[in-house]
Amino acid sequence: MAHKKGASSSRNGRDSAAQRLGVKRYGGQVVKAGEILVRQRGTKFHPGVNVGRGGDDTLFAKTAGAVEFGIKRGRKTVSIVGSTTA
């Protein structure tokens, strides 16, 4: 019986925390300005009307309204419709 664990076993045992990516607000949901709609790496979803894109490609609502997912020119887009600009 070996009294040492072996070369690799003591070097294992690390993992990174999940990044919590994905869609945060779904189609038809009413949102306020500034709410995060999608967290993503790269532009899986592109910003549509009244939606901004952050430095890490996060999509956020620029105005209040309802979330709408669509396709434009073969790209998935996220827009805010029925917004009340006050």
Curated annotation (Swiss-Prot):
Gene Ontology BP annotations: translation
Keyword S-adenosyl-L-methionine included in the entry's annotation: no
Q: Which GO terms describe its molecular function?
A: structural constituent of ribosome
Question: What GO cellular component entries does it have?
Answer: cytosolic large ribosomal subunit
- Coiled-coil regions listed in the entry: none
Indicate whether Transferase appears among the record's keywords: no
- Highest taxon, organism lineage: Bacteria
Q: Where is this region: Disordered?
A: 1-21
Q: Which UniProt keywords apply?
A: Ribonucleoprotein, Ribosomal protein
InterPro entries of this UniProt entry?
Ribosomal_bL27, Ribosomal_bL27_CS
Pfam families membership:
Ribosomal_L27
Q: Which family does it belong to?
A: Belongs to the bacterial ribosomal protein bL27 family.
Question: What is the recorded name of this protein?
Answer: Large ribosomal subunit protein bL27
Which gene holds the coding sequence for this protein?
Answer: rpmA
